[in-house]
Amino acid sequence: MSDSTSETVKKAIIKQVLIESQSANARTLMEKIGENCFTSCVPKPGSSLSNSEKTCVTQCTEKYMAAWNVVNTTYLRRIQQEMGNQ
C-alpha cells in the first residue's frame, strides 16, 4: 500500500471513530439528562408535569447541553491538533 493510500485509509478510520464517538457521547448525554434532570425536577411523577417541573427540566437540560458542548468542542479541538501533529 502506498503512503498516500495508507494516509487516506487512516484518515477515513479516524473520521469514522470520531462519528461513532460523537454518537455515543450524544446517547450518554441524553441518558444523563434523563437520569439527573428528571430525578431532580420531578420528585413525584404524575400524569403530567407541572409548570415548575417543566421549567426545571428545561433549565437543567440546557445546562447539561451547554456543558456537553464545551467538553465536546475541547475534545474535538484536541483530536484535530493531534491529527495535525502526526
Curated annotation (Swiss-Prot):
GO terms for cellular component: mitochondrial inner membrane; mitochondrial intermembrane space protein transporter complex. It comes from the Eukaryota. Coiled coil: none annotated. Keywords: Chaperone, Disulfide bond, Membrane, Metal-binding, Mitochondrion, Mitochondrion inner membrane, Protein transport, Translocation, Transport, Zinc. The twin CX3C motif contains 4 conserved Cys residues that form 2 disulfide bonds in the mitochondrial intermembrane space. However, during the transit of tim13 from cytoplasm into mitochondrion, the Cys residues probably coordinate zinc, thereby preventing folding and allowing its transfer across mitochondrial outer membrane. Heterohexamer; composed of 3 copies of tim8 and 3 copies of tim13, named soluble 70 kDa complex. Associates with the TIM22 complex, whose core is composed of tim22 and tim54. Interacts with the transmembrane regions of multi-pass transmembrane proteins in transit. Disulfide bonds join 37-60, 41-56. It comes from Neurospora crassa (strain ATCC 24698 / 74-OR23-1A / CBS 708.71 / DSM 1257 / FGSC 987). The keyword Nucleotide-binding does not apply. Mitochondrial intermembrane chaperone that participates in the import and insertion of some multi-pass transmembrane proteins into the mitochondrial inner membrane. Also required for the transfer of beta-barrel precursors from the TOM complex to the sorting and assembly machinery (SAM complex) of the outer membrane. Acts as a chaperone-like protein that protects the hydrophobic precursors from aggregation and guide them through the mitochondrial intermembrane space. Belongs to the small Tim family. One of its GO terms (biological process) is protein insertion into mitochondrial inner membrane. This is Mitochondrial import inner membrane translocase subunit tim13. A motif (Twin CX3C motif) lies at residues 37-60. Gene3D superfamilies: Mitochondrial import inner membrane translocase subunit tim13 like domains. It is found in: Mitochondrion inner membrane. The gene is tim13. One of its GO terms (molecular function) is protein transporter activity. Pfam families: zf-Tim10_DDP (PF02953). It is a peripheral membrane protein. Its main location: mitochondrion. InterPro entries: Tim10-like, Tim10-like_dom_sf. SUPFAM superfamilies: Tim10-like.
